Amino acid sequence: GHGAVTSPQTQRGYTAFVHTKLSRVIGASGIHTGTMSFGKMEGDASDKNIGFMLQDDVADGPYYRQEWEGMKQTTPIISGGMNALRLPAFFENLGHSNVILTAGGGAFGHKDGPKQGAISCAQGEESWKLWKAGTYGDVSLSDGVVEYAKTHEELKGAFLTFQKDADQIYPGWKEKLGYTGESSVQAASFNWQKKDLAAAFVGASTTRKASSVARRALDQSSRYADLSLTEEDLIKNGQHVLVAYIMKPKAGYDYLATAAHFAAESSTGTNVNVCTTDDFTKTVDALVYYIDPENEEMKIAYPTALFDRNITDGRAMMCSVLTLSIGNNQGMGDVDYGKIYDIYFPPQYLRLFDGPSCCVIDMWRILGRGTVGGGLVVGTIIKPKLGLQPKPFGQACYGFWQGGDFIKNDEPQGNQTFCQMNECIPEVVKAMRAAQEETGQGKLFSANITADDPNEMIARAKYILNQMGPMAENCAFLVDGYVAGGTAVTVARRNFPKQFLHYHRAGHGAVTSPQTQRGYTAFVHTKLSRVIGASGIHTGTMSFGKMEGDASDKNIGFMLQDDVADGPYYRQEWEGMKQTTPIISGGMNALRLPAFFENLGHSNVILTAGGGAFGHKDGPKQGAISCAQGEESWKLWKAGTYGDVSLSDGVVEYAKTHEELKGAFLTFQKDADQIYPGWKEKLGYTGESSVQAASFNWQKKDLAAAFVGASTTRKASSVARRALDQSSRYADLSLTEEDLIKNGQHVLVAYIMKPKAGYDYLATAAHFAAESSTGTNVNVCTTDDFTKTVDALVYYIDPENEEMKIAYPTALFDRNITDGRAMMCSVLTLSIGNNQGMGDVDYGKIYDIYFPPQYLRLFDGPSCCVIDMWRILGRGTVGGGLVVGTIIKPKLGLQPKPFGQACYGFWQGGDFIKNDEPQGNQTFCQMNECIPEVVKAMRAAQEETGQGKLFSANITADDPNEMIARAKYILNQMGPMAENCAFLVDGYVAGGTAVTVARRNFPKQFLHYHRAGHGAVTSPQTQRGYTAFVHTKLSRVIGASGIHTGTMSFGKMEGDASDKNIGFMLQDDVADGPYYRQEWEGMKQTTPIISGGMNALRLPAFFENLGHSNVILTAGGGAFGHKDGPKQGAISCAQGEESWKLWKAGTYGDVSLSDGVVEYAKTHEELKGAFLTFQKDADQIYPGWKEKLGYTGESSVQAASFNWQKKDLAAAFVGASTTRKASSVARRALDQSSRYADLSLTEEDLIKNGQHVLVAYIMKPKAGYDYLATAAHFAAESSTGTNVNVCTTDDFTKTVDALVYYIDPENEEMKIAYPTALFDRNITDGRAMMCSVLTLSIGNNQGMGDVDYGKIYDIYFPPQYLRLFDGPSCCVIDMWRILGRGTVGGGLVVGTIIKPKLGLQPKPFGQACYGFWQGGDFIKNDEPQGNQTFCQMNECIPEVVKAMRAAQEETGQGKLFSANITADDPNEMIARAKYILNQMGPMAENCAFLVDGYVAGGTAVTVARRNFPKQFLHYHRAGHGAVTSPQTQRGYTAFVHTKLSRVIGASGIHTGTMSFGKMEGDA
């Protein structure tokens, strides 16, 4: 499409030379450069200079010499009519052949097919090289190529195919090559049957018919034109986008033939016939259906099927429409020009576009004008457009808002160094707040978020919204839609649908100008803006301002605002799509407005008058008011207020009594003279013909002192240093819990805490609170009065019972800079951060936590819950009961088809299937093969059962981008069943950041929180971290729809019947925890998900304990272990619920629950089958069941005897059936050592083999359990097994079993080898994922009922697998270089943590940095420091930058700063990081990024590593002691934790002080 601007015909925009040069600057690896006159596209032999500019390090342009200084080259890509015969001369002109060829017809048009066509092109190059080397003697290039062709059949074939080119370039070729045939041969005669040899990789062969279309030069009218089609029928049919062009062929070309070639290039064709065309292809040809050669009119119908669609949601893409309709056709050699004058979208296709989400009606509402006929929004552009600094910019806003409504950034205003966004936006906010308070009216601001990088746009937008706070709706987002492209508009539309999207079209005139006969008109441009979602667009002033335009441009306004509107060629029905509001600017002032409104017919537009406001003689306030009066004067004249007078006279009459409009006459006298003849006499003006404009006295701005703030005097601190007993400061036992809750300003946390021997309880508790908030182990000189106001306070202790309660001010916790939301990682960093490794604390564990309502509202909470599942299942929204689900077993090892078959089998009787937590994108079961099988199974099961089905897909990954890619792929595959899909996130191993990724990016999906691995912290054995109760409670706060809660002692995992309180806390609106009552204030529930050894027999007692059955069951063995298969297993579980309900209702009289269930089973075969399958459970729970059910068989039956042959009934959806062998593994209780242990394996061989990750554990079985049997069960749960044999295991599955290869029961040592194929891989790039390694190695095995404890003490990664991880991108060497110490042995980097860790405000923080940097090298944020309200990042980081700059200048040495970017939301992390780098400017490399890797999870570390590889990645491990402490026999050691940090890419990690400091450790 570039030809619309770069064509020599077009005297606007830039040339093709400039366009391609810019591509190298912004990072293109290659760009299409045309063929320099040697192909079919426009061009000239001198265009070789384009190639030199792209590839050389120094190159001359038409005017300038450019030195590229080692910047990599951009490779020319040549295409457009090129074939083997044209190449030699092209290379000779260019001087080399180091280019990329993309020959369409040159390959697929070759008479012998694409293989020979490709070879012929390579031979074209070879022939030129040999001629150049003198191989053929002193002959012409033409003769040399012919000589080569004599012995090379493919090049010879090119002569026979492209004979016109041969005749022109190689005269006499026929005689030289001995060719005596016809002058034309049938092209595209490639025998497609040959492709059958490749059946293995392309699937079954397709019979193809030979093309019957003769090669008729470029006349393709027989295929690409059908003048019998009528526009009426095409519109009625609704399957085509219609486009009307003004098109002129080059001299000598037939109009219809050229039009058909135009349509061909715009759809399925090219300049020759090609062998790949088949019958279907022709069904999507674009067709010329109307031509008028005399008036150069041409209309083309494009089938909507031609256009690309999103893979994520099926929406339409405007870039695809434009790529076809004004793409390659803009540079065709036979077309003089072609420009779109109108375009029609059929309703069905139009609905696939976004359309506007907001419009002027939303502005009127904010301005208090209602929603109908709100009239003119009086706005301005801050002038000068560049050069104002932040305070003057804010003052200018304040001045205008005294009388006006709306201010926009001028399109180039953004984040210039002299007016940075983080300094300017706060000034705008202050001005808006002050103006609204003073005028009592709403005000509006349009902030420019345009950027090259969508991430930057999003970061800007979020920063602005955060600054705007409660005034966020008053903020529009301006996007320079022409220069940044439609992608930028879509970024704004889809990420911020609540904001008015202000489309600025600066630069459009390069294409739309009437002078330009390419591209599209301004009418078309603005029409497209409505389609893609602009709320408002600049439309020009229809000849009433200074820009190009015409009074007839009012049709643009009608097309943008009406629901049915006529364009030059087509009537468009918008079907209720919201309007796009015209924005008028460019020389407009109060005097020009009345006639503009009269031409348009209304005033429902937005005005942005720069000079019209700031040029007014009395200042911007009066300028704004004068514009509003211009509208009012027109309305009164229109209503007949001034009688039968001209509009001109009516406006003058109004001005007599309105000083501001009168002032506009005195200011803009030339306009007045032209539009209002005789105005001076009528207004009694006798002065000079011109007055001094814009004489506004800026001193008046001082009246606005209230909004810019007064200076603050700071007092010196009088706090003496008092060793470690900080109880006088960090404890206040007079505080009552009742008052703290009533006050609503504190998060309350209840701990079980024990000091080390010899330490005072209160003193230790106070030190704990100090380390958790503003203090440390000594008093520091930087503490001031404010700091103490945010101290955490111990308000209750009970040393005897080891109870301690701390109140944390909510102001302590970090907030998003993007939207002000709260962050759970900040809560955890403080409440279980460094306090988990304190030298005076034996242990400290959270047993309850209370969130005050005002703070709780800042968290997401769930967006979906079980109610949404019930609705899909057809059960209404109240009391829908048990959702019967399963986990596909084996958890790993199934390939895609068996996986789909297993889903289908279960869905015959069940509701819900979840991926097991390690299932993802393993090489043996890749997501792009597995998910389609799941979709087929779901569709078939829904059709057969007539009931909705649900699937929970695992999207967990280290990288949030990978998570989002997975989720979007899955939704795309699910299509109309997307709502049936939940997203599973391994929230413990991947961290809360991963949960937030899912919650905020996919709020319509049920968010399934899997907690595998949590037992490493929550286990009752572990006296650090938090309890399972707290863990699940926090899941509701951060937005989980459902979370695994254990089975309350009724399954195989750890737990207790009293765990039902977890369920109450998750589902009730008011619930009591061990210490606090939590009021949820209507926050949606988080549904308990129960799994782990559950089956139909265990369910009734579970429901009776809980009191209801409104939970989700995921029974693996309970379904797939059922003797009759998963369908009957699922039904049996539903019957387990039903039997409990009937017993509860008294159906079976006054009998025990046990007897009631047995009674039900007598008449229900599936539940009866559960008794026969799970006999040990039956014996334990239902004594005497055999007699009651009349069972006289053996005491055990073969489990999993499901007959897989039944699956063949589903052949339609699973494809060909696969023969399956019956399992020969006998059920040996939990002894799986015959399968999951092989003690003959040697470590040496395993390492040599390189296919296993080896993990060394200290593991102790529960009393009475065999060591090897327990170890094998541990390996089974960590890979492909479960607690029973299941019917889905096949031969392949066993090849990826984890194997115990060494045990030493006496020393409790166990080693397991995990095949690397077990671990999940990214779908985006195939990289490995640490969360997958941890999910298996310390996942469910951390809560097994037969394991007392199991902890990783070492881990080995084989080289081939290790290479799939990131590893560090930077290290201390990079720091030494900045510090001027070289790259070897640079020694100690002397750093500090700014203390107090919390409580310093920005200026004291910067002063503290400056003081340290006088002698030191490196400063880090303490891990909780972020964006607290008292020390916001946008105020603090500039102080750090000033301090760093000053210190570097004074000391002459580099300085380093590590900024904390940790957040729950990866988008927030990226926004913080980009903001900081922007502030750092040329000192960006001096900045490291700190991530709280333990509390935020490895996902957060990966966000930093992959998005900012040039920054030192500083891994803070606060909180790790909850797992790594020697006291804790679960999880992993500190050694393993730090080792893993290197694998995932940390540049540095806190390692403790090896006993030489205050934290735990050893030499």
Swiss-Prot record:
* Ligand binding (Mg(2+)): 408, 410-411, 914, 916-917, 1420, 1422-1423
What does it catalyze? 2 (2R)-3-phosphoglycerate + 2 H(+) = D-ribulose 1,5-bisphosphate + CO2 + H2O; D-ribulose 1,5-bisphosphate + O2 = 2-phosphoglycolate + (2R)-3-phosphoglycerate + 2 H(+)
According to the record, the segments passing through the membrane are none
Transcription regulation in keyword set: no
The GO annotation for biological process reads:
reductive pentose-phosphate cycle
Q: Where in the cell is it found?
A: Plastid, Chloroplast
Q: Which cofactor does it need?
A: Mg(2+)
Leftover remarks: The basic functional RuBisCO is composed of a large chain homodimer in a 'head-to-tail' conformation. In contrast to form I RuBisCO, the form II RuBisCO are composed solely of large subunits. Synthesized as an approximately 220 kDa polyprotein, imported into chloroplasts and subsequently cleaved into 4 mature RuBisCO proteins. Only the 2 middle RuBisCO copies are complete in this entry. There are estimated to be at least 10 copies of this polyprotein gene.
Name of this chain's protein: Ribulose bisphosphate carboxylase
**What organism is this sequence from?**
Prorocentrum minimum (Dinoflagellate)
